[in-house]
Amino acid sequence: MSAFAQPPGAGRKAVDVAIVGSGPTGMALAALLGCQGRSVVVLERYTGLYNLPRAAAFDDETMRTFQKLGVAEKMLPGTNVQRGYVWVNGDDEVLLDIEFDNPGRCGWPAQYMMYQPHLESVLDELITSLPTVEIRRGMTVESVDQQDGDDVLVRATDVEGSAYLVRARYVVGCDGGNGVVRQFAGGELDDYGFFENWLVCDFQLNRDVPDLPTFRQVCDPAEPIAIVNIGPRFHRFSFRLESAANREEVVHPDKVWPRVATYLTPEDAELVRVANYTFRSCITTQWRHRRILLAGDAAHQMPPFLAQGMVSGIRDARNLAWKLDMVLAGHPDSLLDTYQAEREPHVRYITEKAIELGRVQTMRDTALAAQRDAQMIAARKANQKPDKLRYPALSGGLIANHGDMFPQGLVSTSSTTALFDEIAGTGWLVVADGPQVLSGIAEGDRTAFTEIGGKEVIFGLTSMFDGAPVSDTAGVYTRWFAAHECVAAIVRPDGYVFGLARDAAELAGLAKELVAAVAPVPSRPPAPTA
């Protein structure tokens, strides 16, 4: 049978994009593409939602993505805003006490603790409502075949063993660190060599426990512990295990309760989940092989010490969705080459910082831990605060300059006040301080910008011209433009800045560079047929 031959009686589907895996990354990507009208099928091996928590937190950038999807408010009942976090040593002395920004640069609180089943139920409800998106559960992907044509054929079997075929323009593997798609994408795993065994215990609270820490790292060399809330009425205790620990024995409830006795009793809470985890850090060397792409844990895995694992996967989805949409609309396929070029350095930075942080938090050497404690306590007494961790801007790829996230603050029009994205939208934007800044853009470039869905957002930050369409209600943009010494920015559909301009001439040059980079190819193949 040829690679694209169809078994007798097989079900079949033809779509723009096939997504393998319906965790947060896969569902976010499906929703983003579906909201753009792209036909999508999601193949998931589980027969239903995985109704147990895994990830514990997400940040304001992720909430901004949920805002774009129209589900930010629906996410809130499954979250708690996290105001900060504390490190203590084995003697309960405070080593570090950090406050999170509220709001963060994306207009939402910087850190949310969340109950993942709620998040996934909201995303599932959304993608189920989208007419161009189909999710098929209980599907085991057997192969992903691409030949010299313009399609990829995905072969899967359902729980009854029946064959199902999907012919897609592109396939995205969002099927996790042990997923199947990566073997068809090629490449190798670049392993950082970081391995730690942890026991993760989740509890559902029966009553309020006033002294229960909401986000605490116990840096005790005898047994490092992380204590976090994971949304309303749920709490997680994670214990770093010795390499010699009996991993089958430690999961028994009668072994778990003594570990948490300082904080919880069986009257306080119900133990709902116990799992052994091996935290590791690795990144695949190839995120794209022609029409096969990888996202989320299928492309990279990191330890949880910065709470950026799920967040990084959703960043992947946000980066990839608009590029796939443009390519499917006839823009250069080479846009997809910018995906790994932009995302991999960002992921590597976060992974390396998470490893660095984890090694400090979970020291087992008592002498080194005592030295760490003395240094951190002395710094705290001297009121020396650590620098806030800032993730790097994007570089390379489709970035002219800057490459950082464009902020989101409150803005006003003549009829309403809302967060910036609600007013401006989230396609390509030129954001300018006054209309005169736009005067140098060539008419052809302006037309081409409009044809890719581009819009103009005009403030009156310094010029204060009469009738500015948008007012900087909270001063976010006045401060941002001043800090960057610019008068305009071109913002990408994922919220990252393509480039800053100091004057009208620079803006005209940026517009010309962008239009040339994304110019449609002369022709494109028709959509696949079943």
Curated annotation (Swiss-Prot):
InterPro entries: FAD-bd, FAD/NAD-bd_sf, PheA/TfdB_FAD_monoxygenase. It comes from the Bacteria. It holds the Pfam family FAD_binding_3. It is an enzyme of class 1 (oxidoreductase). Disruption phenotype: The mutant bacteria is unable to grow on GRA. Only 25% of the resorcinol is degraded compared to wild-type. The keyword Oxidoreductase applies. This is Probable NADH-specific resorcinol 4-hydroxylase. Keywords: NAD, Oxidoreductase. GO terms for biological process: 3-(3-hydroxy)phenylpropionate catabolic process; resorcinol metabolic process. The lineage of its organism: Bacteria, Bacillati, Actinomycetota, Actinomycetes, Mycobacteriales. Its EC number is 1.14.13.220. Single-component hydroxylase that is part of the gamma-resorcylate (GRA) degradation pathway. GRA is initially converted by GRA decarboxylase to resorcinol, which is hydroxylated by resorcinol 4-hydroxylase. Gene3D superfamilies: 3.30.70.2450, FAD/NAD(P)-binding domain. The gene is tsdB. GO terms for molecular function: 3-(3-hydroxyphenyl)propionate hydroxylase activity; FAD binding; NAD binding. It catalyses: resorcinol + NADH + O2 + H(+) = benzene-1,2,4-triol + NAD(+) + H2O.
